[in-house]
Amino acid sequence: MCISKKIPPAKQENLYYIPPAKQGHLIAVTNRHLFDEAGGQSAFLARLEQVAAAHPAAVILREKDMEERAYEVLAREVQILCRRHQVPFIAHTFAGAAKRLHADGLHLPLSLLRTMRQEGRALPGRLGTSCHSLEDVREAEQLGCSYLIAGHIYETTCKPGLPPRGLRFLREAAASTALPVYAIGGITPERLSEVLAAGAAGGCAMSSLMQGPLWLAAQNNP
């Protein structure tokens, strides 16, 4: 597949912008494997189209098990639909692809962020990482991140057998930094108010947005 497809321009005011979570906005995190036995990539992209149409704060294409070339091809498709709905597109893991696509941001595992030279972290958009301790939060600040994802906060099928870190950890993480902190792990409409009350800037949802009723639209349009 050719990756030279033209990307429609994004409105300048929407670039690099994650809306405040007090309005009920969430970051959508992808998992294409949820569609392995349910329509494959075409169904995955169709669902993402629905998610983007509901105007989440951003879409993170978290398909880090792919080869970078294949990831870039898929990322371009996802970026196109994000731009169509004026939703920020955040790449995951692959800094080279993020730069070539002029992504609105890049999310890196902290282990990968540590090994990246400072000039490699100089991206045009947001830079984020995932934190699982207060030490991670401090390190992420020093490495130049502009937002953090903290988790996992609640029990989730994505982390079977691992106890959640809970709202206390989220509260401490949010209080320890001026950076916006987004909660991940078991985020549902019912739990969003708890996350915000703990000081988080918002939440991230994967399985609950990629499958079943699309509750994001109701959250974004109260």
Where are these regions (language model features)?
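Conserved N-terminal beta1-alpha1 strand-loop-helix module at the mouth
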Residues: 1-107, 111-113, 121-147, 162, ...
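Internal alpha/beta core interface subdomains
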Residues: 200-202
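Active-site-adjacent loop and "lid" segments of alpha/beta metabolic enzymes
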Residues: 160-164, 183
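Conserved acetyl-CoA-binding loop-helix of GNAT-fold acetyltransferases
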Residues: 166-168
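Conserved donor-binding loops in enzymes that form glycosidic bonds
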Residues: 186
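A short, polar/charged loop-to-alpha-helix boundary motif
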Residues: 112-117, 156
